[in-house]
């Protein structure tokens, strides 16, 4: 998994979610 540079501690992944990233361990990762 590649870190997308977005945190998802308080809110879900927003911008990076459009790039295919998902929340894992409080950080947005791309599979």
From Swiss-Prot:
The keyword Transferase does not apply. InterPro entries: Cyclotide (IPR005535), Cyclotide_bracelet_CS (IPR012323), Cyclotide_sf (IPR036146). It comes from the Eukaryota. This is a cyclic peptide. There is a cross-link at residues 1-31 (Cyclopeptide (Ser-Asn)). Keywords: Antibiotic, Antimicrobial, Disulfide bond, Knottin, Plant defense. Disulfide bonds join 4-21, 8-23, 13-28. GO terms for biological process: defense response to bacterium. PROSITE patterns: CYCLOTIDE, CYCLOTIDE_BRACELET. The keyword Disulfide bond applies. Belongs to the cyclotide family. Bracelet subfamily. The presence of a 'disulfide through disulfide knot' structurally defines this protein as a knottin. Probably participates in a plant defense mechanism. Has antibiotic activity. Inhibits the cytopathic effects and replication of the human immunodeficiency virus. Active against both Gram-positive and Gram-negative bacteria. This is Cyclopsychotride-A. It comes from Psychotria longipes.
